[in-house]
């Protein structure tokens, strides 16, 4: 049977419906926390996943965004619907001003992947959408599933 008791600071659980770990700080559960300190400071590993339908043009900006204050470890993606377009040879994945930060010359076929590990973790100070940029031509359509892998810092209370 089950035995129930009050959690102690530093106690860890797995939250099934969120598919993530949580740590008890003594006053609240911190979802995704890798570590927490007395006073509420914590570091959490987070992941945001979303699908993106590619619109016609040379650049396709996602609704999925890197959160404000995120320290990004990398961005991964998989082509879920063939990416098509006249003259298209591949695509880049990045953000405005760093169009290939997470990958370039990425395949167009269903199942093509990008594992865009950030060479040095990058901090973002505003919500920042991802950008797909066409190489060799322009997008006419297609779809990708994207995942943003990042750290989130929680200051002490």
Language-model features: locations:
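Short hydrophobic/aromatic-rich beta-strand motifs
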Residues: 1-24
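Short, surface-exposed secondary-structure edge patches
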Residues: 2-7, 63, 67-69, 121-122
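Acidic glycine-/aspartate-rich tracts in secreted/extracellular proteins
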Residues: 18-20, 27-28, 79-85, 98, ...
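Glycine-rich, low-complexity segments
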Residues: 19-58, 155-157
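C-terminal interaction-tip segments
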Residues: 41-42, 137-157
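Beta-rich globular "head" domains
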Residues: 58-95, 145-151
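Terminal beta-strand-rich extracellular "head" domains
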Residues: 82-123
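Noncatalytic modules at the cell exterior or secretory-pathway interfaces
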Residues: 121-138
């Amino acid at each position: 049977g089950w035995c129930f008791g009050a959690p102690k600071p530093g106690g860890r659980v797995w939250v099934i419906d969120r598919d993530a770990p949580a740590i008890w700080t003594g006053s609240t559960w911190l979802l995704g926390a890798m570590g927490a300190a007395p006073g509420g400071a914590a570091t959490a590993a987070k992941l945001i996943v979303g699908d993106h339908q590619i619109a016609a043009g040379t650049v396709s900006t996602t609704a999925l965004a890197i959160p404000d204050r995120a320290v990004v470890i990398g961005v991964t993606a998989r082509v879920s619907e063939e990416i098509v377009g006249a003259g298209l040879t591949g695509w880049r994945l990045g953000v405005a001003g760093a169009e290939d930060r997470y990958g370039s010359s990425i395949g167009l076929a269903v199942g093509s992947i990008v594992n865009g590990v950030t060479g040095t973790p990058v901090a973002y100070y505003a919500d920042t959408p991802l950008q797909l940029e066409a190489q060799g031509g322009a997008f006419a359509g297609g779809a990708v599933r994207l995942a943003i892998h990042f750290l989130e810092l929680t200051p002490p209370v």
